[in-house]
A protein has these predicted regions:
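Selected alpha-helical membrane-embedding segments in polytopic membrane proteins
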Residues: 2-97
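Hydrophobic alpha-helical transmembrane segments in multi-pass membrane proteins
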Residues: 41-85, 103-139, 156-180
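Membrane-interface segments at transmembrane-helix boundaries
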Residues: 20-23, 84-108, 139-140, 144-151, ...
Length: 185
């Protein structure tokens, strides 16, 4: 059976198929969205879905808090991609654009839909912690694939980026009063 180029490269995959592949840590999907500029909108949808799932999973506030969490998730995503771009591309010699990092890091949040499990009494925190670890691994893969360098450099970029991200997030929270959301990182 012959396959089309779109089937081979994955272009044209549905949002759900891309999210599933990203959650399975399939490096091919990270390469795919890195090079597909039209996937930026899909990556933004992933960030929004994950933010809503996290808000439901935390079940601590009403609609206003959920709205703030979604806004914070988007700001966090933009900041995280920007900081990662500056460190990975400009300091450590990777090769990526900010848009490529936006897309790969957006899809790296795919496992975050399981943050909704945080609502489970007594065990929710454990599920949230496991999802956070999963997101960390997905983020490192996204960074590695987008910047086209080693896993070691991706880990270094993630660690340095996280430290810088925390400083920027705290500054934004202090000035604007919006929690930039650590789930985005």
């Amino acid at each position: 059976v012959e396959r089309t180029q779109a089937e081979i490269t994955g272009r044209g995959r549905s949002l759900t198929a891309r999210m599933m592949a990203a959650a399975k840590l399939e490096t091919a999907v990270y390469e795919e969205v890195e090079h597909d500029a039209s996937a930026t909108g899909q990556a933004a949808i992933v960030v929004g879905i994950v933010a809503v799932c996290a808000a439901i999973g935390s079940a601590t506030g009403g609609a206003g808090e959920a709205f703030g969490a979604v806004v914070g998730a988007y700001l966090g995503w933009l900041v995280w991609a920007g900081v990662t771009y500056l460190i990975g591309d400009k300091l450590l010699g990777g090769t990526a654009t900010w848009g490529e990092l936006l897309r790969t890091l957006g899809f790296a949040q795919s496992p975050g839909v399981l943050y909704i499990l945080g609502i489970i009494p007594l065990l929710g925190w454990l599920a949230v912690f496991a999802v956070w670890l999963w997101l960390l691994v997905a983020g490192i893969i996204a960074i590695r694939q987008a910047l086209d360098f080693s896993t070691g450099k991706a880990v270094l970029t993630a660690v340095l980026g996280m430290l810088a991200y925390i400083v920027v997030a705290l500054a934004i929270a202090a000035v604007v009063g919006v929690d930039v959301g650590m789930a985005a990182a």
